[in-house]
Amino acid sequence: MATKIEWTERTWNPIHGCTEVSEACQNCYAKVMAKRLQGNHIKSYEEGFKVTRNMDVMREPYGWKKSSMVFVVSMGDLFHDDVPDTWLNPVMRVIEKTPQHTYQLLTKRPWNMEEYFLRHPVPKNVWLGTTCENSRHYDRIDALRSIRCNNVKFISCEPLLGAMNDINLDGIDWVIAGGESGSRARRTPVEWFRGLRDACLRWNAPFFFKQWGAWGEDGVKRSKYLNGSLLDGQEWRQWPRVANNI
């Protein structure tokens, strides 16, 4: 499915649903959307945000003619504790059989990702990512870093909920950052974004600033579209160096 998410081109949800695991989950957009779809009697969401397979879309990537960047499971966590290998294996088979696409796997449970890829090869056309919203979750980055492969490894700091100036980006190929959206959005001070950006510059890691979200650079709450995505007057939309060759 085409998407407006700035750092990808399509979303694919052969599995959806999740449970809260950390601070970033507090205002989960996917949970709200899943409940809305359930209320609209969409068959695949009849159980709401419960971790569920959606076999109806499993073969979707075969029909995409244009090579695409694909965010896998935007409506949940592919490596949730309740997702067994018997669900993951068919997803990986589709990925391997569609090498024209690049698949972005983003999880808040990188230990499960690490364990899975100890048992199975990492497809060449995947990027592996984890969410890290503040310094309390640096261990997720360590788990991601420990996965033995040459694939792009990336971090999503959205919503950014704490200063991360001292982040270790050794072995990390890309950092995404953004503020929270929605009526209950928590404000991210400009200093936190600057600190993360400057850390990326020190580590020579491409930095992608997605959005301010509901709170602007000036600390005023307004539409995320009005707040835009300029940090200190500049757009930061850097990509992993390999992306130039895709």
Language model features with spans:
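N-terminal [4Fe-4S]-dependent radical SAM core
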Residues: 1-71, 241
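Auxiliary Fe-S-binding modules of radical SAM enzymes
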Residues: 1-16, 20, 37-40, 161, ...
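Intrinsically disordered, low-complexity sequence elements enriched in Ser/Thr/Gly/Pro
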Residues: 25, 34, 105-107, 138, ...
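Charge-rich, low-complexity amphipathic helices
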Residues: 40, 47, 117-118, 222
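Conserved AdoMet/S-adenosylmethionine-binding subsite of the radical SAM
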Residues: 53-208, 215
